[in-house]
Amino acid sequence: MKKLISWNVNGLRAVMGKNFMEDFKRLDADIFCLQETKLQEGQIDLDLPDYFQYWNYAVKKGYSGTAIFTKDEPLSVQYGIGIEEHDQEGRVITLEFPEFYLITVYVPNSQGELKRLPYRMEFEDAFLNYILSLEKKKPVIYCGDLNVAHEEIDLKNPDTNHMSAGFSDEERAKFSRVLDSGYLDSFRHFYPDKEEEYSWWSYRTKARDRNVGWRIDYFVVSKQLEKKLLSASIHQEVMGSDHCPVEITLDL
């Protein structure tokens, strides 16, 4: 069995002072993916002797960034999706393993008044093309902060957020297209009707205390691996970021 964890840490240096290493050891994942590390190369040295470490950094300092820590050494590693326009912000890492590709992604936020939505749509199209090109070789699992609540059940206040970044019709439609292309939202695969299961809460309104949240962190799994998928969960008990970790286990 393999346990995979994904967590948007909203700044790894900040979360290091909030029990990150204790949480990391307790969760004991075979593969641990991070988004929004907000680091440049050499700014942090994590002592993880049981893990191979892979980091992708944004050109812009203190922004975006991803990392993957894995107990099994991958066959190959790719940073970005091979399109320069989309590879400036350290948003994607791909590891190839014998039975699957594992990708972590930090999808661009469409921002206030949806001012970055046009770029977001371009990124979504390019990313889907990328995973489908890999899928021709072996099944794909991707995880991360996808910056979209797919259905109304995936956020506390859908009625007031239809024009908000993360719940626009355009963003939701792009995610539907991914699922229609042969992928599973792993959490909804097991819990199609479970309510108030969120992975992000705004800092501004003490939303986490009241569980006024959004589920925007996912493991998306190729339908080729459906029978291998054992469980999916959300670790709302883990603090330190405005997001919490999400998990799947696989019979691999």
Segments (PLM) and residue ranges:
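N-terminal, active-site-proximal structural segment of metallo-dependent hydrolase catalytic domains
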Residues: 1-48, 52, 58, 63-64, ...
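Active-site-proximal beta-strand elements of phosphoester/diester hydrolases
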Residues: 2-10, 99-111, 143
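Active-site beta-strand/loop signature of hydrolases that rely on acidic residues for catalysis
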Residues: 8, 24-42, 102, 131-152, ...
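Metal-dependent phosphoesterases centered on the DNase I-like endonuclease/exonuclease/phosphatase
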Residues: 31, 52, 125-212, 216
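Structured beta-strand-rich core segments of catalytic domains in phosphoester-bond hydrolases
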Residues: 38, 43-110
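Conserved beta strand-loop-helix elements of the APE1-like EEP
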Residues: 61-76, 205-227
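Active-site beta-strand termini and strand-to-loop segments that position acidic
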Residues: 71, 95-98, 222-223, 248-252
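Surface-exposed cleft-lining segments at the edges of enzyme active sites
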Residues: 82-83, 108-124, 159-164
